[in-house]
Swiss-Prot record:
Gene expressing this chain: BJSP-1
Pfam families referenced in this protein's UniProt entry, alphabetically: Hemocyanin_C, Hemocyanin_M, Hemocyanin_N
Protein name according to UniProt: Basic juvenile hormone-suppressible protein 1
Keyword Acetylation found: no
Signal peptide stretch: 1-17
Tissues with expression: Fat body, and hemolymph of larvae.
Family membership: Belongs to the hemocyanin family.
A GO molecular-function annotation: nutrient reservoir activity
Superkingdom in the source lineage: Eukaryota
Gene3D superfamilies recorded: Di-copper center containing domain from catechol oxidase, Hemocyanin, C-terminal domain, Hemocyanin, N-terminal domain
PROSITE patterns for the chain: HEMOCYANIN_1 (PS00209), HEMOCYANIN_2 (PS00210)
UniProt entry keywords in alphabetical sequence: Signal, Storage protein
Length: 748
């Protein structure tokens, strides 16, 4: 059924590809172009990025546009001159892997971003993008163009293709890519038994579906038990988009990033770590430890990623010695920076090289601390080269120092924001960084009863539906990983659509109901959390024990009426989550009708919100078959409007939905009330409530008991290929691995 749905969704595929050529870039001035036309231009620029463009209009604009002759059409001519000088000296060659944490690569990418960002209008922006599309490295172009679409005001409303559709290589295992190339080279003409063993299905519509689970597993550590979570394509997209929203190199006020609550990116890090702990708890695994530089790194990692150059992402073996004579200088610098930051937190200030003081005393100074830890401080002189603590940590863990800042650098999983969450050591790095962050929080005064209380408001009841998770399937379009031949380039489409069928965590929709009584009509902020009840050893956890494990599921504004109020929230509408990102091909189907007309409607209110959020299916951890005991917490607090930080622009906060209710409530401290140590004598008030819940995992064994499954031709699969569904049933053809025909001669 899934394949039939895919075929139906691709039924208009030919007409879509045909009609997208009716939008001719460069034919007319594009300043007044509507948002969907702009979006189609961006989609064309990002299609099959590893090859020269297949579109004649892009190629024509790239040929005719001369940057030196149009210097007056850019806001900053010095930016243009610097790029031209760099381009003439030589840039990262086309075909090489772009690494956005490599200083040489990044320096060039920032110059590419600046020249596109400084274009005076959308017409100049697109013409510059076309010129760059045909001349610079494809990965560098995608990175700079994505940053521009995120931050240019005339790009608001544009929906970008998911990064795993633009460059699938770093989101799927190498065996998927290998099988896709095999199918393309043979035009899907393979032995049916081999196709069945590989988990490949081919339809008459040239749709090739490759099952991710049929690949051989490489298991190094117990961390691989939760790889379904850490290697989730949407989770890694979230991390990549978080970086694109707040790039550490983007320090100039002209980009407006310093007008947001940028420092609370640290709150996102703490929430990711808490989410990991809940996932580990589902498998009865204890918390990870902060990385220690003087101890062997016991946890190795096998990325299973092959890049488009044919290079494999390096494998890190277990028990690796971190500090060697080659990287000892990096270790010393890291120690100095970390000591300086911790001393600054304890003393309340850090002195910069030019003599200015960075204060680290008040709650709002978290903005400064986060920039010091993760980059983006805008430091002067040599300060910026060593203040980025996370960058130094990653550099220390690289496989050697000889390839730094080289064009031919082969990245590790840590080097890319789109893959770093896959590596278990990155979570330990985050743990060490957040330890410094928590030291700052520890120095702040504890919340008082007045901070928690809401006089006249009482929560009477707090309930939720049954919480059930399961592992479902998702079909990911990996066609852009394939190279097109001359015939396909002329047709402007691939003859075959390649799809990777992946297993992913999901849960049934649920509702949360809160009954609140109020003695007055008043606006309020409702926060809903979920966290553990017991630790990994089965011990009951106190509020302070688990406060850093509490996940903020939802935060929203609500108007309480006098008397009883019943608040109902659906899991699909909770703040901070989005629905599944649609296929780009389906976006095109929605944009372009059968007559080639393009819809001009766009929900501008949700453009940023839909771009940078977690999928709703990851709200809950996996849980356990018999149920995993958890606790949910709700607190209703008044709206306060006197806490606006001086460097925030509330219009930007509202537009990007940085936190719920930002238009009227400036109290959006990440993690409140669990972000500081709690004085239990002042904590419990009438406007908050805990409730016990259970998270049940439904797997194949439960599904088989309620479905009519013919098991006469099936066998139980018990081997290293199956680690998610331990009781997966497969057809007998799985045993016929060595057969070269469909004749079943191995039967008894």
């Amino acid at each position: 059924m899934r394949v039939l749905v895919l075929v139906a969704s691709l039924g208009l595929r030919g007409s879509v590809v045909k009609d997208d050529t009716t939008v001719v870039i460069g034919k007319d001035n594009m300043v007044t172009m509507d948002i969907k036309m702009k979006e189609l231009c961006i989609l064309k620029l990002l299609n099959h990025i590893l090859q020269p463009t297949m579109y004649d209009d892009i190629r024509e604009v790239a040929r005719e546009w001369v940057i030196e002759e149009n210097m007056d059409k850019y806001l900053k001519t010095d930016v243009v001159k610097k790029f031209i000088d760099t381009f003439k000296m030589g840039m990262l060659p086309r075909g090489e892997v772009f690494v956005h944490t490599n200083e040489l690569h990044l320096e060039q990418a920032v110059k590419v971003f600046k020249i596109m960002y400084s274009a005076k209008d959308f017409d100049v922006f697109i013409r510059t993008a076309c010129w760059l599309r045909e001349r610079i490295n494809g990965g560098m172009f995608v990175y700079a163009l994505t940053a521009c679409v995120f931050h240019r005001t005339d790009c608001r409303g544009i929906t970008l293709p998911a990064p795993y559709e633009i460059y699938p290589y770093v989101f799927v295992d190498s065996h998927i890519i290998n099988k896709a190339f095999m199918m393309k080279m043979t035009k899907a003409a393979r032995d049916p038994v081999m196709l069945d063993y590989y988990g490949i299905k081919v339809t008459d519509k040239n749709l090739v579906v490759i099952d991710w689970r049929k690949g051989v597993r490489r298991t190094l550590t117990e961390h691989d038990r939760i790889s379904y979570f850490t290697e989730d394509i949407d989770l890694n997209t979230y991390m990549y988009y978080l970086h694109m929203s707040y790039p550490f190199w983007m320090t100039d006020d002209m980009y407006t990033v310093n007008k947001e609550r940028r420092g609370e990116i640290m709150g996102t890090y703490t929430q990711l770590l808490a989410r990991l702990r809940l996932e580990r708890l589902s498998h009865e695994m204890c918390d990870i430890k902060s990385i220690m530089w003087n101890e062997p790194l016991k946890t190795g990692y096998w990325p299973k990623i092959r890049l488009h150059t044919g290079d494999e992402m390096p494998v890190r073996s277990n028990n690796k010695i971190i500090v060697t004579k080659e990287n000892v200088k990096v270790k010393r610098m890291l120690d100095d920076v970390e000591r300086m930051l911790r001393d600054g937190i304890l003393t309340g200030k850090i002195e910069r090289r030019d003599g200015t003081i960075i204060n680290l005393k008040k709650a709002e100074d978290v903005e400064h601390l986060a920039r010091l830890l993760l980059g983006g401080m805008g430091l002067v002189g040599d300060d910026a080269k060593f203040m980025h603590m996370m960058h130094l940590m990653k550099r220390l863990l690289s496989y050697n120092v000889y390839n730094f800042d080289k064009y031919t650098y082969v990245p590790t999983a840590l080097d890319l924001y789109s893959t770093c969450l896959r590596d278990p050591v990155f979570w330990r790095l985050m743990k060490r960084v957040t330890d410094t962050f928590f030291l700052f929080k520890k120095m702040l005064p504890k919340y008082t009863r007045e901070d928690f209380d809401f006089p006249g408001v009482k929560i009477e009841k707090f309930t939720t539906d049954k919480l059930t998770t399961f592992i479902d399937e998702y079909d990911m379009d990996i066609t852009n990983a394939m190279f097109l031949d001359d015939v396909e380039m002329k047709k402007k489409r691939s003859d075959m659509t390649m799809v990777a069928r992946m297993a992913r965590l999901n849960h049934h929709p649920f509702k949360v109901t809160v009954d609140v009584t109020s003695d007055k009509t008043v606006d309020c902020v409702v926060r809903i959390f979920i966290g553990p009840k017991y630790d990994c050893l089965g011990r009951l956890m106190s509020v302070n024990d688990k406060r850093m494990d509490m996940i903020e599921m939802d935060t929203f504004l609500y108007k309480l009426e006098t008397g009883k109020n019943t608040i109902v929230r659906n899991s699909l509408e909770m703040h901070g989550v989005i629905e599944q990102r649609p296929w780009t091909r389906r976006i095109l189907n929605n944009m372009i009708g059968t007559v080639g007309t393009i819809s001009k409607t766009v929900d501008v209110e949700s453009w940023w919100y839909k771009r940078h959020r977690l999928p709703h299916r990851m709200l809950l951890p996996l849980g356990r078959r018999g149920g995993m005991p958890m606790q949910m917490f709700v607190i209703v607090t008044p709206v306060k409007t006197n806490l606006l930080l001086p460097n925030l622009d509330m219009n930007i906060m509202k537009e990007r939905k940085t936190c719920a209710g930002a238009s009227v409530s400036t109290r959006c401290r990440s993690g409140f009330p669990f972000d500081r140590k709690i004085d239990m004598t002042h904590f419990f008030t009438r406007n908050m409530k805990f409730t016990d819940v259970m998270i049940f995992r439904k797997d194949l064994s439960l599904s088989n008991t309620i479905k009519d499954v013919d098991m006469s031709d099936m066998m139980m699969k018990k081997d290293d290929l199956t680690y998610l569904d331990s009781d997966m049933l497969v057809r007998w053809s799985y045993k016929a691995v060595m057969m070269m025909s469909k004749d079943d001669m191995m039967r008894m």
